[in-house]
Design a protein with these regions (language model features):
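Short amphipathic
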Residues: 3-10, 37
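Intrinsic-disorder/low-complexity, polar/charged segments enriched in Ser/Thr/Lys/Arg/Asp/Glu/Gln
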Residues: 4, 31-35, 67-69
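Intrinsically disordered, low-complexity regions of eukaryotic proteins
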Residues: 6-8, 42, 69
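Amphipathic, hydrophobic secondary-structure cores in small proteins
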Residues: 12-57
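C-terminal structural segments of small proteins and small subunits
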Residues: 48-75
Length: 75
């Protein structure tokens, strides 16, 4: 899937991946997609909750080569 911006949040512990994603999403316009790459094991649950609370859409959450990849569409 195509994305408009990418955030490398590898090696960052909670809550930094969420905080950086929030900042990155603020720079996008409605409908644009942010790709986040993280390694924090709690990130899937954190991003699910973050999107639920903010109204952004978690398009996908996958594991690739020991990394977690999230695609989030800005509301």
């Amino acid at each position: 899937m195509e994305f408009d911006a990418e955030l490398d949040a590898r090696q960052l512990a909670c809550p930094l991946p969420i905080l950086r994603a929030k900042k990155s999403l603020a720079q996008l316009t409605s409908g644009q997609v942010l790709k986040v790459i993280a390694t924090d094991k709690g990130a899937p649950k954190d991003f699910e909750e973050f999107c639920r609370q903010t109204g952004n859409v978690l398009l996908s959450s996958t594991a690739q080569d020991g990394e977690l990849v999230f695609l989030i569409r800005r509301r």
